[in-house]
Structures are given as structure tokens and as C-alpha cells.
A protein has these predicted regions:
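A cross-family acyltransferase "interaction/gating" segment
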Residues: 108-111, 145, 156-221
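Short glycine-rich anion-binding loops that position phosphate/pyrophosphate groups of nucleotides
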Residues: 78-80, 151-155
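Membrane-anchoring hydrophobic helices of lipid-metabolizing enzymes
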Residues: 1-72
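Catalytic core of membrane glycerolipid acyltransferases/transacylases, capturing the structured
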Residues: 18-27, 36-39, 66-126
Length: 241
């Protein structure tokens, strides 16, 4: 209770301010560039990381912070919406997320999603899903950084759920490197606490890039291989927790 009261008092004014600014920017995209809109969202995400007292323990943080002209596909496991907040707070280069279309109907969230040009996928439509995979892949090929939560939805367990077919399709069109990202304890920043407002430790690992050649050599097993790499690191995090 104490934690959420503090978060509401500290975060709500900032989110409301961001909402108003982005509503204006989204209506005048010819005047406000994508990079400028992303900076507004990023500043809000950095503030949310701060007010939730989230301490990110990161392996290979230079991978996401380094300047790079080529596009990438970040492939992450998924426990919490706060993973997107942390990724945006870390990346100066704009990130484009692939998200289920239902999220685009959530107040406040939809405004921020629109500002950072989130690509929405309809999981009930195979045709639309294929179109989204192609669009995301082409944008990565054109030097954009794409973020995919490859399980398709948040894991209800403490393990990584099987990866969906979208991953190899996107990499096929992207023809670029893939960065695997493992999150551990990423539900903690938004966990309800009754009588405390503690620092929340989240463990993150950015893997070394997987080349497009690796995909070509492992097409049939690609989703399984990448899933197992992240699961192995998650198991390591859990053993050390």
C-alpha cells in the first residue's frame, strides 16, 4: 500500500504531463519527429524506473547503449509490461515494439504506443499476423530496432513459455542481427507491497548478437534454440537469487 501510494503521488503527474504532450505531438506528426516523440516517452520511462526504485543489474548493457546504424531485433522473455519501460529507459536509439492489438485500447498506454510507432498484431488473424511480421522485418532491415516478446503473451509461470512462429518470420525478412534479452524478477517493480517501499532488483542480460547467418543455418530449430538460451540464463539467475 505504501509503495503504491508513493508511486501514484510521484508518477501520475508525470504520466499526465506526458499524455498531454504526446496527444499534441501525435496530432502533428509532420511537425514533431519520431525521435522527438520517443524522447518524451523515454524521459517518462526513466522517471518510472526511478520512482518504482528499480535497480537494474545488467550484463552487457553496452550492447543496447552503443551507437549502431544497422537495425536489430531484440527478442525478450516476458513477465511484465515494465520490461518495455526498462528497455526504453536504456535505449537512446528509438525502439519499435510489437504488441497485441488489445493494448492499443488501454487509456494512456495507447497514446504512448502511438507516439513510438508500436506495431499492433491481431493474434486471431493469420493474414494480419503475417503482414505484421513482414512489416517488422522490413523495418529492421531499414535500420530500425524492433522489440519482440517472442512468447506472444506474459508468462504465467517462472519459466519462458514456448516461442511463437513470429520470431523466425521476422528474422527472415529482417536479414539482420538478433539480440536475445533475458529478464528476471521484472514483475517486482509493479508488485503490490503493503507496508514497504523497497528497492526492486531486476536482473537483465543482453546476449551477444546472433548473426543472420546463424538463422540461415538453424532455420527449423531457431525458435527452440533461442528459447533455450534465454531459459538457461533465467535458470542461472534463479539459482543465484
Amino acid at each position: 500500500m505504501i509503495k503504491w501510494l508513493c508511486i501514484i503521488l510521484l508518477a501520475v503527474p508525470r504520466v499526465l504531463y506526458s499524455q498531454i504532450v504526446l496527444l499534441i505531438m501525435n496530432c502533428k506528426k509532420d511537425k514533431y519527429s519520431y525521435e522527438r516523440r520517443y524522447r518524451v516517452v523515454r524521459n517518462t520511462c526513466k522517471w518510472l524506473v526511478k520512482v518504482t526504485r528499480t535497480k537494474m543489474n545488467i550484463e552487457n548493457v553496452d550492447i543496447i547503449k552503443s551507437r549502431h546504424e544497422n537495425g536489430r531485433v531484440y527478442v525478450c522473455n516476458h513477465f511484465s509490461v515494465f520490461e518495455a519501460v526498462m528497455l526504453i529507459s536504456l535505449s537512446e536509439k528509438p525502439l519499435i515494439f510489437i504488441s497485441k492489438k488489445e493494448n492499443s485500447k488501454v487509456p494512456f498506454l495507447r497514446t504512448h504506443m502511438k507516439a513510438v510507432e508500436t506495431i499492433c498484431i491481431d493474434r486471431e488473424s493469420v493474414k494480419q499476423s503475417l503482414k505484421v511480421c513482414k512489416e517488422a522485418g522490413i523495418r529492421a532491415k531499414d535500420n530500425a530496432d524492433i522489440v519482440l516478446f517472442a512468447e506472444g503473451t506474459r508468462s504465467k509461470t517462472e519459466d519462458v513459455s514456448p516461442f511463437k512462429a513470429a520470431l523466425p518470420m521476422i528474422v527472415h525478412y529482417a536479414e539482420t542481427e538478433v539480440i536475445l534479452v533475458c529478464f528476471h524478477n521484472s514483475k517486482n517493480p509493479v508488485k503490490f507491497r503493503w507496508l514497504s517501499y523497497p528497492k526492486e532488483n531486476v536482473n537483465i542480460k543482453f546476449f551477444e548478437p546472433l548473426s543472420y547467418q546463424y538463422y540461415l543455418e538453424n532455420k527449423k530449430e531457431y525458435a527452440i534454440l533461442t528459447h533455450d538460451m534465454i531459459q538457461s540464463k533465467l535458470d542461472e539467475f534463479k539459482r543465484g537469487n
